């Protein structure tokens, strides 16, 4: 679980300083216990690429999903994030005036894996969104902890092209958002005898770029040109960049590829290599 570093502020300070709404992100809790030392370096930057930004709204923002990819020494780590918000407790302003809008603090439940099972993990998170803590503690509730523990230790790893794993997530809403019944989620890895398995779907790439623009992108990639993708929707960037790399098969992109670049790493855009 990733969220903003502890902070203390008043409503008057928030009204006077917009920067007070943005805080550095920290790993608040990791499961299983003791795994903090093996987490990828600065994984919290990728959970909150633009920093942990508080929001002033009358109602809580809707939960949002996003993904990221980290590479180190040829090993790729996929991250699937579910961002939700909790109401913050603010110290009263000196003038005693209460703001009409509540202050909402973001936190992220992030699942890390080296298997290309992004969509399966996304569906799993969609089922457990109802288990997120609602008391403002920003720690895993007992029900959420039990669900994550079962996913980590009781589910066998799928075998490419041979073993598909289906698990039941109890006590969650069904696909229509109603009820309180069980939900089934399937994990599968394609066989290695075929094309490399895709970590993301190709349709966002095909939808966002027409044939001409896609051909120009592929020409730049084959020519090892620097490619910078910008979008106001962070969830699109991993799908587009991973899809573009997949279309290079049987060749591979030999240079660093960061689908979502955190604000803290912006200086990497000045690097001379692609």
Description of each model-found segment:
Residues 1-274:
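UDENN/dDENN subdomains and adjacent acidic, S/T/P-rich linkers in DENN-containing trafficking regulators
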């Amino acid at each position: 679980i990733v969220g903003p570093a502890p902070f203390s502020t008043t409503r008057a300070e928030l009204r006077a300083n917009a920067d007070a709404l943005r805080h550095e992100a920290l790993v608040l809790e990791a499961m299983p216990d003791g795994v903090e030392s093996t987490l990828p370096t600065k994984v919290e930057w990728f959970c909150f690429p633009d920093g942990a930004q508080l929001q002033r709204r009358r109602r809580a923002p809707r939960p949002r999903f996003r993904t990221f990819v980290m590479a180190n020494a040829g090993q790729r780590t996929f991250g699937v994030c579910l961002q939700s918000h909790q109401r913050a407790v603010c110290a009263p302003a000196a003038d005693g005036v209460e703001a009409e809008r509540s202050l909402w603090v973001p936190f992220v439940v992030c699942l890390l894996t080296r298997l290309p099972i992004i969509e399966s993990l996304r569906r799993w998170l969609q089922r457990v969104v109802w288990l997120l803590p609602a008391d403002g503690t920003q720690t895993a509730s007992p029900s959420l902890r039990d669900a994550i523990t079962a996913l980590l230790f009781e589910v066998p790893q799928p075998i490419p092209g041979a073993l598909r794993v289906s698990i039941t997530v109890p006590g969650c809403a069904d696909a229509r958002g109603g009820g309180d019944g069980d939900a089934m989620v399937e994990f599968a890895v394609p066989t290695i005898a075929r094309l490399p398995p895709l970590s993301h779907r190709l349709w966002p790439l095909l939808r966002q770029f027409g044939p001409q623009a896609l051909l120009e992108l592929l020409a730049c990639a084959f020519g090892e040109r620097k490619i910078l993708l910008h979008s106001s929707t962070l969830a699109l960037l991993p799908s587009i960049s991973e899809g573009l790399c997949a279309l290079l098969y049987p060749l591979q992109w030999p240079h660093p590829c960061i689908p979502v670049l955190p604000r803290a790493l912006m200086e990497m855009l000045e690097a001379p290599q692609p």
